Amino acid sequence: MDTLLSLKPILTTLVMPACGGLLAVFAMLVWAWHRSTRTYARMPIVFAGITTFLLWLLSCQAVAIWLSLHLLPQVSPVGADDLKRQHVQAIVVLGGGVENEAIEYSGPTLSPDAMSRLLYAIHLSRSTQLPMAYTGGIGWAGQNGQTSEAEVAAIALTRLGAPALRWQENQSRDTRENALLTAALLKSDGITHIALVTHAWHMPRSVRQFEAAGLQVTPAPMGYIRSDLSPLLQWLPSGKGLRETGWVIREWLGLLLT
C-alpha cells in the first residue's frame, strides 16, 4: 500500500493537463505515423513530433532551472547585515501584479508573486529599519478605473500589520517606468542608494533599468527558480515548469533588447 501511495505524485502529474495532454498528442502522432506509408505524408508528423517534444522539455522544471542558470546573470541573496554595510537608504519593491477580482477580499489584492516580494521586503525592513517604497501602477493590460498596484500593496501592509510605505509610485506600467518614476520620487528626498526587491529571474533586467535611471542598486533577490521535487518529477511537464521557462526566456529576451 505504501509503495502505491508513493507513486501518487507521479500518477497525479501524468493525468494533469500539461503532461496528460502531451502524452495524448504523442500517442496520436505515433498512430498517424503507422497509418501513413508515404514519406511526404510523414514529414508533418515529424515536425509535429519535434514541436511537441520541445514543448515537453520547456514544460519541465528541470529545464527551467537549467535555463535560469545558463541564460541569466546570477545574483546572490543578501541579508540585513549586507544592506547596513553597504549603507542602503531605502528598500524598493517592484510590483508583480494584482488580482482585481479577489472576491474573498471584496476587492483587489496582490498576486502571489507580488505578495512574495512584499513579504520579503517587510522582512528586510524590519531587520534594518529601512523605509520601503512600492512601485506599480496599472499595467498595459489593465483597465481604467482599476486600483493601482502600489495602492493595493499599501492596503496589504495594513492587513498584515506591517510598517507603512514611505513612498508609493502608482503611475508606472512596466519595469522601465518603474525605474524612471521611482528614481524621480526617491531623488527628491535625497535617496540615491536602494535595495531592490524582486524575483531573482527578474533582477538582472531590473537592476539595469534602475541604474540607468541614476540610482545605486543593491540587488535583494528572492523567489529563485528551484525545485524540491524528485528528479523524475522535474522531468515531467507541468504548468509551473512551463510558466517558469516562460519567465526565463522573457527576461533573457528583455536583456538582449534593452
Residue ranges and their predicted role:
Residues W33-M43:
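Membrane-interface helix-boundary motifs at transmembrane edges
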Residues M1-W33:
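Membrane-embedded alpha-helical segments of integral membrane proteins
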Residues V46-Q61:
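Hydrophobic membrane-insertion alpha-helices, especially the h-region
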Residues S238-T258:
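Structured C-terminal subdomain patch of bacterial secreted/periplasmic proteins
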Residues V25-V30, P44, T51-T52:
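Small-residue hotspots
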Residues T3-L11, V63, L67-L71, I249-L256:
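Hydrophobic alpha-helical segments of integral membrane proteins
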Residues L57, Q61-L236:
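A structural signal for short, hydrophobic/glycine-enriched beta-strand patches
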